[in-house]
Amino acid sequence: MGGSASSQLDEGKCAYIRGKTEASIKNFSPYYSRQYSVAFCNHVRSEVEQQRDLTSQFLKTKPPLEPGTVLYEAELSQFAEDIRKWKDRYVVVKNDFAVESYENKEAYQRGAVPKSRILPAGGKVLTSEEEYSLLSDKHFPDPTASSEKNSQPFLVLPKAFPVYLWQPYLRHGYFCFHEAAEQQKFSALLNDCIRHLNHDYMKQTTFEAQAFLEAVQFFRQEKGHYGAWEVITGDEVQILSKLVMEELLPTLQTDLLPKLKGKKNDRKRAWFGLLEEAYNLVQHQVSEGLSALKEECRALTKDLEGTIRSDMDQIVNSKNFLTGKIRAMVAQPAENRCGESVQPFLASILEELMGPVSSGFSEVRALFEKEVDELSQSFHTTQDGAQLKECLDQLMKLPLDSVKMEPCYTKVTLLPERLLDLQSRFRFPHVDLVVQRTQNYMQELMENAVFTFEQLLSPYLQGEASRTAVAIEKVKLRVLKQYDYDSSTIRKKIFQEALIQITLPTVQKALASTCKPELQKYEQFIFADHTNMIHVENIYEEILYQILLDETLKVITEAAILKKHNLFEDNMALPSESVSSLTDLKTSMGSNQASPARGASAILPGAPGDEAPGSEVFQGPEEKQQQPGVPGSLAREESASISGSSPPSGEDGQVSVSGVDNSAGNPLSADNSAGPLSSHLSEAEAGEPPKDEETAHKRPESSAVPGSLRELKELLTVTVFVESAPEIGNDTLNGTPVPQEDKKEEEEEEESKIHPEASGPAAIQQDSCEESEVREREAHPMPLEAEAPGVNLGTLPEGRGPTSQSTGEGLTENTSCLGPIEEPSEAQGPTEEVLLATVSTQDSTEAGGEAVHSVTVTPQEDATLSSNPICPVENNEGPQVSEDQEVLGGNDSPALAMDTEQINDAHVYECHWEVEDAPSADILDVHDCDVGSPGEW
């Protein structure tokens, strides 16, 4: 039969293994202790500064599965090493990715201890005898194997479809199936388990995990090993155990391999058993030693926490000072080395990475769309809500369906072939780790996509079948748009990590002999109390990393600008990062794999009759309550984006509002009110006759080319129509009515002159003004309706500041009372500046600046339009007050006092108001709107 592994590993050899393990842990301890303190200090700093991850994401993140969730269970044939026979076992794989084997299904159900439990971290899955023999021979350095031919197979298979699980330092697993489909399902599942066990620990963000990985890196650099390391897979105990085994392996091969007797297959089996016994011994001792080391570090940081928190500013300043010193020494040689050995190859490496990675993510997108289309088609056929829920539950399991996801993963497996030259140029043989990490990201993105789809669709499952069918299609398009953006973000992250992982070891190794010895002299700049929190080696590595990061970001940004593989730029104008429901962001029916910014635009619903069929599925309960006519919060938000000026009388009651991009803080500054985008003139401004009510409600269709300048203009323009009757002005001297046409002529004449002087003094009683406004609102409500030509303003990015919010509240509450006008001595200076700012929209636009909000309002009923207290007033003119307001003011308080010698018959009030962004609500429905002063908005 051959030698037994247990007989070769005698007590002396076990003692030797324990001694080597203890020495390795002792050598590793200083690195871990230093990195533990540094990582803990960084953790406290991020906690104090409340640092957050700025990575944007549209899709909802799927919560983790409940512990103990079963991913796979089936009865199959497994080779039992203890009895060296094939046995039928009941195999169960849960979401801890351990492969557990039970005697039978009944034993599993009653909670029996599994016969075997395999954690296949670092393993490889093979499905043919030839592939397995090649791999196992590679890790069996038998000196006599070259002269011996192995005619017999390693195992006699009881069934036609085997699965081999190769593992480093552990016995291999062997499974058999009757059908190829079962073989494919189990092998795909094992690959999923290996990927997650290899990389899930490295994805942890705890400071202890970061400290351990940094310690392993510095520990290996002292031995001349740089960059990625194939055995950094699994958890911290597995990683450190493999570190020890890496040192033990040459000795074990020298001492034990020559003693093995028998045929090649027997010696091979004995060697693998010997390695497993040694590895288990090392792993047990490493687990104990690492636990003790952690307790020491926790006690140390507990004592340091007070110092870290109290001296945080000093620690940060000291580190920044030290960073500047070391960067001055390192920057030039690092940049030279990067320019010679790295920068010329970054673009070509990125090009080779982008193809397979992007094709894999595109395959995931296509799979999601295909599954949703099948779900939709099934619902169209059956119209059964219960069956739809079952299909939706199956869709939620799609990311865990290894067979369906495998074609997506296969697209990325082309990377090793595309990057063959990396092994010779950059000594990076571990492209398979990049492949596995990419596949994990693909599975995670699919999980988020199906979870977002289910969350957005669930409110509409109980409705009518026709509405549910429409909702399925619209939700699918929404999720696909969000997927495109998140896919671009994740792929750029993958490219960044891969480029740095590939090229950083080259720079580190090149500078190790020249720059690293110089680091010791910089330790004198560290305070004695801060030596545990600041280490020059960490700062040195951070500087090298940042230099390479800047170079990689350049090539990735260039690829995004060129739209390669549907990558999006980082500075795209996007809607909010969190989309909680269909009402948050409308998606047009014709959307496909377009930019999220383009997907954000949709049709703004106007009157209820204009709404597209099926669009009600996008309206939440709150939105539906606000639509019938109550202004509500949406109306207040809309009104915050509308600015107005006192209009010439006699024109049609139309308001033209032009959006302003990056408007300045002072809304009355002429310098900040001109822009390259010209404002759209309303029909009243163009001198055209007013249209009837039906025309006012009709939604114009945009003919602008997508992405053109005209489309941008339309995105920034909204037209508000005011329906009102002709107004008869009141002479403020004697209360006699003044014809509106005469007032218009006088106002146009005075407006052409524009006297840069302030009006005389005036005093207003607030109580009487409020009472008059209340009565005016009750008698003459003035609805405003907004239409945006071809654009959904609700999808524009929200950018309201405190000013715009207060503006919206003021307009909705109709606080349009006149405030006290300042004395001439106080108001003359600022009034002259303000008056110069009251230029027309067209003039300011032609001057070349930012686009201006121009508002023209002409009420045609007896509604009161109060002028702004800060608006410019013509010389020797006072505010215009209606007859009703004058009478009401006399009931409760003294009438409006004005100097009759300083008041003319014509009254012109020009005011220019600006808001930063176009409104983002879906409906602008402001009733009883009297244009108040900006100070009250």
UniProtKB/Swiss-Prot annotation:
It is found in: Cytoplasm; Membrane. InterPro entries: Niban-like. Residues 640-651 have a biased composition (Low complexity). It is a lipid-anchor. The modification Phosphoserine is found at S578, S581, S595, S601, S646, S708, S768. Residues 688-701 have a biased composition (Basic and acidic residues). Keywords: Cytoplasm, Lipoprotein, Membrane, Myristate, Phosphoprotein, Stress response, Translation regulation. Residues 584-710, 724-891 are annotated as: Disordered. Residues 584-595, 655-681, 802-817, 855-869 have a biased composition (Polar residues). CDD domains: Niban-like. The keyword Phosphoprotein applies. One of its GO terms (cellular component) is membrane. A lipid is attached at G2 (N-myristoyl glycine). Belongs to the Niban family. Regulates phosphorylation of a number of proteins involved in translation regulation including EIF2A, EIF4EBP1 and RPS6KB1. May be involved in the endoplasmic reticulum stress response. This is Protein Niban 1. The gene is Niban1.
